Amino acid sequence: MPDIRTTFLLSLAGFLFTWLATWGIIYAGAGMAGCGYLIVALVISVLLLRGPAIKLTFEFGIKGSPWKLLTLATGMLFSYHLARQVMDRFPLRYEDADMLPIMRVMGNRFISGDWRGVYDVIPEIWNGIQPVYLPFMWLPFSLAEPGDFDIRWITFSGIWLALIIPYLSLEKLATPSEWLILSSIIILLWWFHLEPTNNVIKLTEEGVVYAYYVMLAVALASGNPLLIGISVSACLLSRYSFAGALPALGCYWLWRRRWRLIMTVMGVVVTFIIGSVLIFGPRVTMPFTELPVKYVEHAAKVWIENPEYFLNGLGMAKYFGPEHIQLQYGFLVYGSFLVPFLFVLASITYEWKSGKRLHNVEIALVLITLTYFNSMLVVSYLYLFYTPVLFGLSAISLTFHSRRNSIR
């Protein structure tokens, strides 16, 4: 039977994680909220190691819980109404944020059959801009053109796909843990729809990333090698925030002698990468080759034009300042590999010396890597910080059902 106390502590930490990324910025201040955000992520990761082992099959549904269907439908309708108001009030313009307009052009080129031209310069945006987004980031948005709808509905759909796992994990709200997760979901929905500065629905593409990383949490919990490979590929080829965790994951799987998992994941990831290069051309690799240098230059520009992104956000950039961007970038790059490696090294050492097996190491590893990476970004936009929150809430909610081996 799952450890009820650990499950409660996980849920409480998940609620605090959510609060720090939303209301905590206002009431605790950006500095305290940012430090607390990092600390709570570490606490969740450690609790996951000590908590019930997450095991599940793919029996998703709403069996025996008609209230789920009713409340889900009601919530989505209300959410749709609020999102529609946001989109009507703020037409999409590249002058406000160019991410989605760029992806719309990339998607239109793809739909029209100009696959090799997807990464050509876009002359109608900023008098010529080079698109650099990875395939799994922009491909979902290509559905907007044939569907003739606002591209931001893809972001909206991604948000709900990311929230569906923690929501379906709730049953009768008979425990404080379930109420804490439900409260976290409500806080996030309120924040995304009604708080004016996060811009998740109004301007960003981040909903698809939220969905990918929640899919990764489910895949890791399932232990299915093919699903893990697909999920890792989707995350790596959208926002590569957890790329530094891959060598550490490989080391842990080697320690556990999971040869089939290693070979399957490597095969799927390599297939997607090679396939992307063959279909879209070598420029698809620009985010890994050319973007890092431009990223530091962009950070210096943002410090001059919009310092509030750093000072009022959760990231650590406020402590480095504009004069130490290169130093912070070093912490970002090297730390993104070192932190997960040390985490895995500590886990393996514990297992070896104690003879006991830790639970959920892969999920805990991804969470701490994601949180560290986003906190150390030299340009730390607020909407990026909800990926670890949604990943963490999904992992925590899955512990509710570790005994039953399914979600009902």
Segments from the language model and where they lie:
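Start-transfer (signal-anchor) and selected internal transmembrane alpha helices
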Residues: 1-83, 355-368, 397-408
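Transmembrane-helix motifs of polytopic, lipid-linked glycan transferases
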Residues: 151-176, 346-347
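Membrane-interface alpha helices of multi-pass inner-membrane proteins
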Residues: 217, 226-251, 370-371
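Specific aromatic-rich, kink-prone transmembrane helix
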Residues: 207-225
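Perimembrane helix-loop-helix junctions
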Residues: 245-270
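Aromatic- and kink-enriched transmembrane "portal" helix at the membrane-lumen/periplasm boundary
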Residues: 138, 162, 166, 182-209, ...
